[in-house]
Amino acid sequence: MGFRLPGIRKTLSARNEASSKVLDAPKGYLAVYVGENMKRFVIPVSHLNQPLFQDLLSQAEEEFGYDHPMGGLTIPCSEDLFQHITSCLSAQ
């Protein structure tokens, strides 16, 4: 009795693609992790150029350097503050 490796590979590949699509941010957006619970937010990349958001990036650099524990960009502030900042940026 043998195994059909091409079929197994195809199944595993499809599962990996499906799971990575759930975690990917849409084109033009970036996933960041915020707060003590590391809640995931997906924000427009245009926020990265805003001075208010650049202050958050500076804080992240001071606290984490380039070693982010979640593997993505981690922002060291409360979820409430982050939501307030992103709503202000979206209103501009």
UniProtKB/Swiss-Prot annotation:
Top-level taxon: Eukaryota
UniProt cross-references to Pfam families, sorted A to Z: Auxin_inducible (PF02519)
GO annotation, biological process: response to auxin
Annotated S-S bridges: none
Induction conditions: By auxin and cycloheximide.
Family, similarity comment: Belongs to the ARG7 family.
Name of the protein this chain belongs to: Indole-3-acetic acid-induced protein ARG7
Classification lineage: Eukaryota, Viridiplantae, Streptophyta, Embryophyta, Tracheophyta
